[in-house]
Amino acid sequence: MNKKICFFCVGTGGHVLPVKNLVIELENLGVNPREIYVISDVRGVQYLENLNINIFTTNAYISKNGILGYILNFPKIINTIYEVKKFLKNQNIAVVFTTGAYIAPIAAIISLLLNAKFYIQEQNVYAGLGNKISAIFAKSVFSSFEDTKNINKKKLNYTGPIVNTTLTRSDISLFEKQTIGFMGGSQGSKQINNYVDKFMETEYQLNFNIVHVTGKNNDKLEINSKNYRSVDFIEEMDEFYR
């Protein structure tokens, strides 16, 4: 039996789309999609509908009270681990990969139970609680920013963000007008916002709509374009990805 890979991603497109991009890339490299497994939640699976892979939907506990929340709801976490372990049993999973969020600690534990190599992708300058905890067990943490904080530097491997390499300008030109979304609302906002400023200076004549989440307490860009709209924060991120 061939060794297989399992991705853990939950929530909105920010955590799930990178996994989708990786799955597409693996398929292009010749990996059988039936040897790829994804653990996600109800929100996450909607971004994976067109992929012919093995998907398991779980309702992992979300802590709004840091580590204390996880401690108080430990039975729920154990139940999720049991369900996922049962799904992956006898599948010969060799690699576990997570894009973070509240599923990351569960991914770390599953990797230990399966004796699989564990990897993390960190999308922010400051790692979230899930990735901070899980990084202890990770073989490597792939970062989107060169100066990622609060994770052991020995484990960091700067790769940049995970993007869709199959998307070309010819694909975009098939549609009359596209909307580009820039997410500057998390850690790393300043770097992303500076990039948007430079992007608009060089690409302002393109037939694009721009939606830019700047993040709270960040300076607004003075961009004079009818196609550009900025907001501090978006409550429902699913709406942003639609």
Q: Regions from the language model: what does each represent?
A:
Residues 57-62, 99, 121-124, 144:
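Short beta->alpha connector loops at strand-helix junctions that form conserved
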Residues 43-46, 95-114:
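An aromatic- and histidine-rich active-site surface loop
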Residues 4, 37, 43, 113-170:
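Active-site-proximal region of nucleotide-activated glycan assembly enzymes
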Residues 37-39, 43-45, 51, 172-242:
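Donor-nucleotide binding loops and adjacent catalytic segments primarily
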Residues 15-29:
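Short amphipathic alpha-helix
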Residues 66-95, 113:
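An amphipathic, basic-hydrophobic alpha-helix
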Residues 2-10, 27-76:
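Conserved nucleotide-sugar phosphate-binding/catalytic loop shared by glycosyltransferases and other
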